[in-house]
Regions:
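Terminal, non-catalytic protein-protein interaction segments that mediate quaternary/complex assembly
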Residues: 2-301
């Protein structure tokens, strides 16, 4: 495993305050597009906990761009940002597929998919742990190494998709690939998903990969650029539609306030990628606020 090294130059380089606007506008626009243009599926694989089929309204090929000055946090729906970071670290930092490792961090988002052996099968972290042929490193260390030594390469790709072991996975990866691009010492990230639960997964994943971009950029001596979150099949489920309509309406009623809200993120990068924890990132005054709606969406399995 590569050793993490913080940038030289003291605390100012490793403890950052990042300010920007929320991405409510982009997110709500996507929900409205999906509501208007989406098509209901007819024979879904997914079911709710009660055994009923979970029908989804689906669209095709939508990308949300998170440019500099935008932070993927919302005020029309509360984001549980600590759990999202814990899951990210479980996959990318620990490269684990053991559900107990995530539970030890106080996060239970994978409990429904735990197999008899206590894992989620050969998925997510297990794929990142695989060795890359030309370096013998795991996929994460290989990415960090190549971004330091071959920045202009157009092959900085990390993949979670494996056609040889998909049958062993509790859930085939939704986010299945990332591509990293360096432009003028800035690091850009494209995230590709095969399937995106727009109500539950998308806000969670967009925040995760924005955080990952900050971490990998710092680890490789680059400045974070933009994030493109590309969804092949964005969708929401039938039991999500009413709450989605409430969220859209809430945003429209509070648009002026929400669009002018400033998001302030504090992130401590001093311990490097492998020392970073969920406690090293905070959204100023976010968790304490009672005017950010908590929205409940049933999980489809």
């Amino acid at each position: 495993m590569l050793k993490s090294k913080g940038k030289k130059g003291g605390e100012s380089m490793t403890k950052k305050v990042i300010k920007g606007r929320s991405y409510d506008k982009e997110y709500i626009n996507q929900l409205e597009w999906l509501k208007e243009k989406g098509v209901w599926d007819k024979n879904p694989r997914t079911v709710y906990e009660d055994g009923n089929k979970a029908y989804s309204k689906r669209g095709f090929d939508h990308t949300i761009l998170i440019n500099k000055g935008t932070i993927p946090v919302m005020f029309s729906k509360r984001l549980y940002f600590k759990d999202a970071v814990k899951e990210l670290l479980w996959i990318w930092q620990q490269r684990s597929n053991k559900v107990s490792d995530l539970q030890e961090m106080g996060c239970k988002v994978w409990d429904e998919w735990e197999k008899e052996d206590g894992t989620i099968g050969n998925a997510y972290g297990a794929q990142l742990a695989r060795e890359v042929d030309d370096t013998g490193m795991n996929q994460v260390d290989n990415l960090i190494h190549k971004l330091k030594t071959d920045r202009d390469s157009r092959r900085h790709i990390v993949t979670l998709w494996d056609i040889s072991s998909g049958h062993e996975m509790a859930l085939k990866p939704c986010v299945y690939e990332t591509q990293w691009v360096v432009l003028d010492d800035e690091l850009y990230l494209k995230v590709i998903t095969r399937s995106t639960d727009s109500a539950l997964g998308e806000p969670y994943n967009t925040w995760q990969y924005w955080v990952l971009l900050q971490l990998i950029a710092h680890e490789t001596g680059l400045e974070p650029g933009g994030l493109a979150f590309s969804m092949a099949i964005p969708h929401y489920y039938d039991r999500h539609e009413t709450e989605i309509e409430r969220q859209i309406e809430y945003y429209k009623k509070n648009k002026d306030r929400i669009d002018n809200e400033e998001v302030v993120v504090g992130i401590d990068l001093s311990k490097g990628f492998y020392g970073f924890t969920a406690d090293d990132i905070k959204i100023k005054d976010y968790a304490q606020r009672d005017d950010i709606p908590k929205r409940k969406f049933e999980i489809a399995i």
